[in-house]
Amino acid sequence: MAVTVQMLVDRLKLNVIYGDEHLLSKRITTADISRPGLEMTGYFDYYAPERLQLVGMKEWSYLMAMTGHNRYQVLREMFQKETPAIVVARDLEIPEEMYEAAKDTGIAILQSKAPTSRLSGEVSWYLDSCLAERTSVHGVLMDIYGMGVLIQGDSGIGKSETGLELVKRGHRLVADDRVDVYAKDEETLWGEPAEILRHLLEIRGVGIIDIMSLYGASAVKDSSQVQLAIYLENFETGKVFDRLGNGNEEIELSGVKVPRIRIPVKTGRNVSVVIEAAAMNHRAKQMGFDATQTFEDRLTHLISQNEVNDD
């Protein structure tokens, strides 16, 4: 997926100083950003023209110390046909030579009042999200108490119905049926809906319902980190399920491992409440509060006491 410069401008509210006509035609194909420091000195051996060029205070100060002729020569060599745009931070003044180089090469000049480091982080975050490789998985992604929970299971098990019940209980729907997941880094997985399914939920016997229209903006979310996976499966006599919570089952999506809990489903069981409890318990474990460990410690202490009493 490529990101147009127009998409970047709209998302980060950047000011377009020059090149409105190039915003849709210029595409950003890499999440890497270039801070052209050495390039300002004329060293272009490892220059990556396909990257978005970000000019901060240091680059700007060095640029402004040059003569007009040298300034134009450097900028003209920086601005190549592969270059999507140049972004100037801190609302720094745009030199005339930058306008000339941009006009000669068809490069857009963008400006932001944000400090360079913050702007760099925002641009990188957005580009990483847009350009990361997506994997589609079947399930329902919910935001439960601020935690992204991916609900999976066999077809007809009641995933969407459970999602609807969770929405009624005050939680937020991220995606139903098809969840597009991508890795932000080696340990962070994010999920979002397919655009055609955004805010929609399918309930057998009812059809497709618009959660945004029925329950309001507070009931939906555009994307969420995936921190826990729940797998719903039919209860079968004799089938072993984790009763202590000390299982370490995981699934791997887009190269990121996510802890998974299997929950048996049978008539009369309030699955949405169980999922709420599972999400809260997982968060408690992340904070260092482990009920299973507490139980095991108490059991060990009780056994030790009984052994002393027997002696």
UniProtKB/Swiss-Prot annotation:
Catalytic site: H138, K159, D177, R243
Region annotated Important for the catalytic mechanism of dephosphorylation, chain positions: 264-269
Catalytic activity: [HPr protein]-L-serine + ATP = [HPr protein]-O-phospho-L-serine + ADP + H(+); [HPr protein]-O-phospho-L-serine + phosphate + H(+) = [HPr protein]-L-serine + diphosphate
A molecular function (GO) term: phosphorelay sensor kinase activity
Its EC number(s): 2.7.11.-, 2.7.4.-
Residues at which ATP binds: G153, D154, S155, G156, I157, G158, K159, S160
Gene3D superfamilies cross-referenced by the UniProt entry: HprK N-terminal domain-like, P-loop containing nucleotide triphosphate hydrolases
Domain of life of the organism encoding this protein: Bacteria
Record note on quaternary structure: Homohexamer.
Function (record text): Catalyzes the ATP- as well as the pyrophosphate-dependent phosphorylation of a specific serine residue in HPr, a phosphocarrier protein of the phosphoenolpyruvate-dependent sugar phosphotransferase system (PTS). HprK/P also catalyzes the pyrophosphate-producing, inorganic phosphate-dependent dephosphorylation (phosphorolysis) of seryl-phosphorylated HPr (P-Ser-HPr).
PANTHER family found in the cross-reference section: HPR KINASE_PHOSPHORYLASE (PTHR30305:SF1), PROTEIN YJDM-RELATED (PTHR30305)
Additional free-text comment from the UniProt record: Both phosphorylation and phosphorolysis are carried out by the same active site and suggest a common mechanism for both reactions.
Family, per entry: Belongs to the HPrK/P family.
Entry note about domains: The Walker A ATP-binding motif also binds Pi and PPi.
Full protein name: HPr kinase/phosphorylase
